[in-house]
C-alpha cells in the first residue's frame, strides 16, 4: 500500500446526494470525465444535461478541463465503478459548505501523508488507526486535530498507532500547521486640532484609542506623517479585531471633537497582508528621511545666520 495516496473518508465510494469536489480531466460528447479528489481520484462523469439549468451554448462556459468543481452525486454503481454527478443541482450555499469541508479534509490529508512518509507507514493504515476513528468520534478529523492542540491525551485516548512515535510526530505537525495565527488589522485616520489645546488634544485622542485595547486585542497608534496616523492590532478573532478598531476610532472622534478638532477616516479597519505592511513601513521610512532632511536644512540655516 502507498504512503502517499488514499481516499480521505472511510467509505470507498461517496453516497447518493453527497457533495464532492472533482477535478475535470476531459470533456467528451456525453459529458465531462472527472476525478473525485476526496476519494483517491476515482473517476466519475457529469453528463452534459447535468451541467446547467440553462440551455448550453458553450460547454467551456460551464466547465473547463483542469478546474475543480463542486458537484452532487446522482448514482453510484460500486460493482462497475460508475459514478454519475450533477453540477446544475448544486446551489451557491452547497458550494461554500462543500469547499469548507474539502479544505479541512485536505489539511488533515496533508498532515497524515507527511507522517505516513516519515514513518514509512501506508497512508491507509494511518487512516484506519487514527484518521477515520477521529472522523467517527468528532465528525471531522480536522476538529479533532484542533482540539488536540490543547488536549492531546483526551483526543488520542484509545487509539492504537501503527508505530511508536507516530502520535508525537503527528501532534508536532498539528501544532505547527493548525495553531491559529494572529491576523494583522489596520485603520488609517487623519487627526487635526487647530484649537487652543492643539497637539495635546491630539495626543489625548490617540491615547483614548489605545485605551480601548484588551488582552486579546492590543491596539497601537503610530504616526506616519502629520496628520496621518495608523491604528494597528493583531487578533486571533478577525471580527473582534475589526470591532475593537472601530471602537478605537470612535474614541478618537469623541475626544478630538470635544477640543474642536477633527478625525477623518482614510481607511476603515481591515485585515492587511504582508505586502500592505511592507508598503506602510516604506512610507514611514520615507517620511522619517524627509523630516531628517528638513531638520538638517533648518540647522544649516541657523548656523549660517550666526
Curated annotation (Swiss-Prot):
The modification Phosphoserine is found at residues 52, 273, 295, 303, 305. It is found in: Cytoplasm, Cytosol. The keyword RNA-binding applies. Keywords: Cytoplasm, Initiation factor, Phosphoprotein, Protein biosynthesis, RNA-binding. One of its GO terms (cellular component) is eukaryotic translation initiation factor 2 complex. Gene3D superfamilies: EIF_2_alpha, Nucleic acid-binding proteins, Translation initiation factor 2, subunit 1, domain 2. Pfam families: EIF_2_alpha, S1. Its main location: cytoplasm. The keyword Cytoplasm applies. The modification Phosphothreonine is found at residue 179. SMART domains: S1. CDD domains: S1_IF2_alpha (cd04452). Belongs to the eIF-2-alpha family. Eukaryotic translation initiation factor 2 eIF2 is a heterotrimeric complex composed of an alpha, a beta and a gamma subunit. This is Eukaryotic translation initiation factor 2 subunit alpha. The lineage of its organism: Eukaryota, Fungi, Dikarya, Ascomycota, Taphrinomycotina.
